[in-house]
From Swiss-Prot:
PROSITE patterns registered for this protein in UniProt: CASPASE_P20, IG_LIKE
Annotated Ig-like C2-type domain residues: 125-201, 212-305
Effect of residue 806 to A: Abolishes binding to TRAF6
Subcellular location: Cytoplasm, Perinuclear region; Nucleus
Origin species: Homo sapiens (Human)
Low complexity bias spans: 11-27
Name of the protein: Mucosa-associated lymphoid tissue lymphoma translocation protein 1
Gene designation per UniProt: MALT1
Amino acid sequence: MSLLGDPLQALPPSAAPTGPLLAPPAGATLNRLREPLLRRLSELLDQAPEGRGWRRLAELAGSRGRLRLSCLDLEQCSLKVLEPEGSPSLCLLKLMGEKGCTVTELSDFLQAMEHTEVLQLLSPPGIKITVNPESKAVLAGQFVKLCCRATGHPFVQYQWFKMNKEIPNGNTSELIFNAVHVKDAGFYVCRVNNNFTFEFSQWSQLDVCDIPESFQRSVDGVSESKLQICVEPTSQKLMPGSTLVLQCVAVGSPIPHYQWFKNELPLTHETKKLYMVPYVDLEHQGTYWCHVYNDRDSQDSKKVEIIIGRTDEAVECTEDELNNLGHPDNKEQTTDQPLAKDKVALLIGNMNYREHPKLKAPLVDVYELTNLLRQLDFKVVSLLDLTEYEMRNAVDEFLLLLDKGVYGLLYYAGHGYENFGNSFMVPVDAPNPYRSENCLCVQNILKLMQEKETGLNVFLLDMCRKRNDYDDTIPILDALKVTANIVFGYATCQGAEAFEIQHSGLANGIFMKFLKDRLLEDKKITVLLDEVAEDMGKCHLTKGKQALEIRSSLSEKRALTDPIQGTEYSAESLVRNLQWAKAHELPESMCLKFDCGVQIQLGFAAEFSNVMIIYTSIVYKPPEIIMCDAYVTDFPLDLDIDPKDANKGTPEETGSYLVSKDLPKHCLYTRLSSLQKLKEHLVFTVCLSYQYSGLEDTVEDKQEVNVGKPLIAKLDMHRGLGRKTCFQTCLMSNGPYQSSAATSGGAGHYHSLQDPFHGVYHSHPGNPSNVTPADSCHCSRTPDAFISSFAHHASCHFSRSNVPVETTDEIPFSFSDRLRISEK
């Protein structure tokens, strides 16, 4: 079954394996047969006993006048035995082909000779699949077996596929999972082939249910095939406006189907494990249950009562507290101006996805936001292209910088989605399709920030919020604390996608385009975001496409411009400063002197916390040397640097468009990205090639340079802090700041804008470390394109392929005279 419940039909792949010999068309003449087939036919005829060999074939062919061979022809065939690789039968078949003998006629002759072995080469037997694999729903950890059986001659071979990927060692009739895992869920098909042809089995869907531990006892000894409900819905008492989520999970073979009922009536289109109402009202009160069935059996879940109304909770307080309710103690209002103990920001931009559409806007957005936040005295860590493991470790490092009263800001630009009010950030190594276990849950990070007793928690999420249909897990997160200091700024509203502006090669996301114009304003953060939302609403490019959504529990007038308390020399502050400075320390500029007298200057600049640029220049050349070139090479394998992308004449050629105006001219530039992957010191080689006057030969010299661990590499993020489990998604969030509507399935972003950018950090002592914001990009500067991009799910398209594959084809439609919107 497909995800929509339709039967899946397996079609042969475009490059399906075939046997070494292909059966020829019946009406083709023998001279149209392929050489390998002719030689195989000839070998069998040459080796055949008397009465079934080539002479008997010539005799039968002679019975048809036009195919009769002369004595000279037969003698010519006989003499072929005297040649080293001669074959009388091959000679005969070619002569018959010249006379117009068809495959059908040859088959008739072989039938008369009862030469079945040769006959099978011309009419190979087919393959018949007798047992197809069944779709089934199972529990994680169960023993599972998918079975396919077929008959054919001489024998058949099996190969299993999951979607479009061949399964290693899956070459038997049974595909066995000793302890099935959630990642094993998906669609499977078996290809059966022999030397002549191949067939595909029916599709089999394997649904693996990972149920909470609280249900484990009730499902011990569950059968792989018997229909059984493992997770029952539960009765609930909800306030109007809350989210209702009912879950029923069943296992069995064939795969179970679901139908939800309310008050004895079936609910239209509610045929999944989950039944959800984003905002309940009195009309949703009633009795609910789920009918589960397959072709062999059916069961009903237990009936549950959903009550909508006020809860009867009592809150204890003293008489003084009751009298002061609504009149805050003036002693607590120590100042009219909120102060931050410190300000820390983590900025992550994911662009170069391995199995999903690549993005461009995060490069510009993270760079510009870094410059702006540093002007507001934020300690900023900016990182590009992180894997899941690296994202988790980056968050760990971010949390180390937080403390009581510290302002924490997390910005993310990249693919994302939102399910059941929980936002998920997608790492660059996420599989296709991805699920919650492959991503980072923002609400989990918020909980960890709350544990630090931060003064302000700001989340700016520049990603899509569409629902991920491949992820049906309901996260159960620990309850968030009720703190009046949380602000969420979503680039788009629930269930919608985010867009980017293209302009001359570089890109801004729509959100950042408007945010950067107001970020430095001294206003309460929620007021600032409200004005950004108003600006976006006035732009004709975004109307009906993207709208900023703000969620906040902020009760004080806190702003990103709030000053930092005068506690510069407290122990906590010193630790934070040291930790942050450690992640932003560049190697010192150096001058290399070679024996020939040539001097080469090495400089270093930071584009992001994990991206560094090395620039080299020849500062002195003795007069007797008429030519010399210098370049850097032999970088650690951890950084995966392509030599073709190193030692370029301009920063732009290396992919560094943002800092070119701040780098010295007339150098060779090499861009090192993903410094977080560096496990040892950064050691590389500086090579010098030079030529003396009057000599034709070129002389080579080299020096090895060790610059230690630059920037973020010093934190050894590849080792981690052993806290990965802190971010693992559990099952249903009841936090007060979570969306109640179901939304996005892999989401995404972006593409480009050619403006001057400033703010590169150099290792030269004389260079300033402050930065200036990029020029604003106003709507009056009409961009080249306005593009929506979101992560695509592997869709069930089966034309010309044996499995559904992801497509990135664009379907453009008119948007304005100079703009185009592409929906991927």
